[in-house]
Amino acid sequence: MNAVEIQGLTKRYGAITAVDSLDLTVRQGELFALLGVNGAGKTTTIKMLSCLTRPDGGDARLLGRSIVSDAAGVKRCIGVSPQATAVAPNLTARENLALLCGVHGLSRQETAARTEELSRALGLEPILARRAGKLSGGWQRRLSIAMALIARPEILFLDEPTLGLDVLARAELWDVVRQLKGRITVILTTHYLEEAEALSDRVGIMKDGRLLALGTPEELKRQAGCDRFEDAFIAMVREAGR
């Protein structure tokens, strides 16, 4: 069964078409990267798939549930770590996790167990007692991902997960994302070429709201006739602009 099936998905903002008749399939258990420069339509696509904004055309089915006709069902099976981390700055990391556990209806005992489980998995133990607003960008992003995983989603969206992080924090977060590969379906957006190449099973390259190319990093290099993924990306984007 496919995790995500997108058909003709379209979003307009006035005269601007942010996503233009997107067709795409993501397999269950896959780590899929949407890659593109700023304004390519990546974040808008994630917002539609996570039912944060309604499409103007087309539809998508997540594990068989329509984002148009069954948004509530979609939301029950997904987790989202947005580009701007949605942590409560005045609460500690532990309190942020507990807050989300409460939102999802977990008991006090379940909350304690889930907090311990996620803290151990994502290495959050050193910062559990610290206020989220005082944490570095890397720690805030880890906390945001942990919060997105509380309800054990089958599909996880990571929108620009390493944006603004330094080299070390990015490498550490890559390790966190790699732990999720094969366990759940992960869809991440990024404009970092090396991130898409290092982490993803397949990559979709977007430009101006359209899907230019789709395949594994190796397949995309072969399609473009390039030895380096960066060169393949540049060649495909430039060709589309002609």
Label for each model-derived stretch:
Residues 58-69, 73-74:
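Conserved ABC transporter NBD signature motif
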Residues 214-215:
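ABC ATPase "signature
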Residues 156-160:
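Catalytic Walker B motif of ABC-type/P-loop ATPase nucleotide-binding domains
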Residues 90, 131-138:
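Conserved ABC ATPase signature
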Residues 152:
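Conserved catalytic motifs of ABC-family nucleotide-binding domains
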Residues 98, 102, 109-127:
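Conserved ABC ATPase "signature" region
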